[in-house]
Structure formats: C-alpha cells, structure tokens
C-alpha cells in the first residue's frame, strides 16, 4: 500500500479566542499561489529517506510513555465516559511540529513527548511508519475453500497546509519531506479560509475512509491562519479467528451508571492471558498476527489499571473462554489545556520560538491541538480512525484440553490496539458503557 503523509497547520479562532492575528505577514520565501479549492503541493528538496523497522525503537518507547501520561489526564476529565484516542496520531503531529521549534518551547515539547534523543527522533518516526506499512496485507482464500478475504489495512498520512506567498524555512520543508514524506499544500487563508477548511476536512475524510468527515468545525479557520499540521490514521483488521455471530448474546454489563445490556461476543480459544494485582488481561490477535487488541479489566471498578507494558509482560498462552462486548465509540476533543498541564505551555505562548518553521514576523505559536478518534469492534474485527490537527497561529499438538480461563468482559475495561513488532500503541481507550454508540 502506498503510504501518504500530510501535515497541516491551521488557526482555530472559534476555540477560546486562541486564533488571533500576530500582525501582517510578508512572504520572504517563494511559495507559489494556490487556491484552497485546488491547492498546490510544494515538496521539500530532500527525497524521502527509506527507514528500516529497527529505527522505530525510540519512537515506540516515546509514544507509549506519552500515551500513559495522556490517558491518565483524559480519563480524569470524565471518568465515566467512553474514551478512544490515538497516541500515535497525536505524537506524530506534535513531533512534526517540534521540528520547527527552538528554545524552551522545544525543550518542553521533547519532555512531554518523552523524546530523549531529539537528533534522531524524526528518523525514528520514519522507521515507525515503515513498520506500520509492513503490516498491510490482504489474502483471499475463497478459491481454496477458505472463509474469504483476510485483511489488515493500516495507513498513516501527514501533510502541511500553508499560506501561499508566505515564508517557510527550507530546512523545515526538507525534514518533513525526507522523514515524513510530507509536502506542503498551499492554500489562501487570507481571502478564503472557509475553502481551506473544506479542503482539509475533505482530505481527512478521504484518508479515514469517511470515518472522520469533519475534523475542523465551521469557522475554525480565519484570515489570520498561516499553517496547519494534520495527521490521519486509518485501520481495518480482521480477527485471526472471527467470532461466530450466532453466539453473540445480549448480556449484562456493569457500567458506572448502572447495569446495561451489551451485545457480548463469545469464543473459546488459545489466547495470551495474564493476571496482576486486582486485574486480568487478554490479548486478541488480528489476522497475520502483526497487530493485537489487548484488554485489561479490574476485579472491581476501583482497581488501578496496569500500564500497557505491564499487562503485555504478564501474558502467557492459555485456553480462554472469552466474552467481549461489541462496541462503537468516538472521542472528539481539544488537547490544548491538557498539553499545557502536562508541561507544554511555552508552545502555546507568543514567544517567537517556532523560527525553525518561518522567519516571518510576528512569529507563530500553537493555537490549539484538535483530535478525533473512533473505533468499531465486532465479530469480524476492528475498524478505527484518528486525526490530529496542530493549529499554528500568529500572535493571534493434540493433548488433553486444559480447563479454559473464563474471562467475561462485563464491566469497564481499558484497551490498547498495538503493533506487536514495535509494541507501539496505535489506539487506546476505556469502555465504560458499550451500549452507548457514537
């Protein structure tokens, strides 16, 4: 599958007046005009570097640590709500943004994102994308009498949407081109910000197979917008062993607000199962076994959930009698306040510390970070999508069968959808009520 990347930087004035103009801009780097309805793509001079999977180690570790921090903050906002987010999408968008940061802003971004080696992180993110690309496979065994098409599709897309006739640093464009495969789409926010918004949303809609049709709401772009970074992730994967839908039954689920009825899928299979202090976990593989869905559930609602590495480290093969609810949930949120609380405040201040992006004055800073994600889990497998926009603004063998472990997921649970080769958490979340649909 061809990998497309897309990075977009927009200003969102509709959110807490974060989008205010820094002043008049004068283009000093020649970016040819492009209408928002038919944007012109400008690539950096550097060719895309082919990274290898081993480059992904640092990126994977950083994303998983960032994921744990962010998960805790997001759950605390509304402990009884369903939650899904993509730490990979958010980290990719913010790491691309950090490529243009300097000074305290860069230091804080690296700390929050758990980037310990800034000099190599962009190559590592490139390697992570290469690892994700490698899981894309489709096999149709219908002709051989099999069940049909087995598929894993995982696409990562990034790009940059910039104001035409505005100065952007060549080194910044080259880095995004070589490590992220990202070109800049030139639009004209000054004369038609709404057309730019429509174009960006159309791109996200296409990349996510219509699962996220409107990342940016009405009025989110203004004449003061100069640049918007956008990442989009789409995933569709069949289970290695599909659930028999004839065995799906309406069963009780203990949600925070009281008992609800969930459509519970059932199977008995050899799975990776583990236990810890007050919690149990099971890992359900997708076809080809490159990706997995890891579920952790507490013995009671007040038990602290393990970190993903702790849960994964406790796993061992067991025969499991599994009950897992079908669910279809989504989350749409601004991450600005959360990221500030996590220690990334300088990036949201008018400090002129994104000079790696542009030498234009007044300088740019982050106005907002918008994230949407959704996930659908059923008998066949999983379909999920996520998108993140970082909005830059101006100052403005045959043997005796063992006794199966019974694991019925009938109360709130945490999940991680992981790339098994790198351990990277692609999607994570918390299901408190599987009967609530998006």
What are these regions (language model features)?
Residues 379-438:
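C-terminal soluble interaction/assembly domains
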Residues 109-113, 243-250, 302-311:
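Short Gly/aromatic-enriched secondary-structure transition segments
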Residues 118-297, 313-400:
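Non-catalytic, conformational "gating/processing" segments within enzyme and secreted inhibitor domains
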Residues 6-18, 22-189, 420, 437:
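Detector for small/aliphatic-rich hydrophobic stretches
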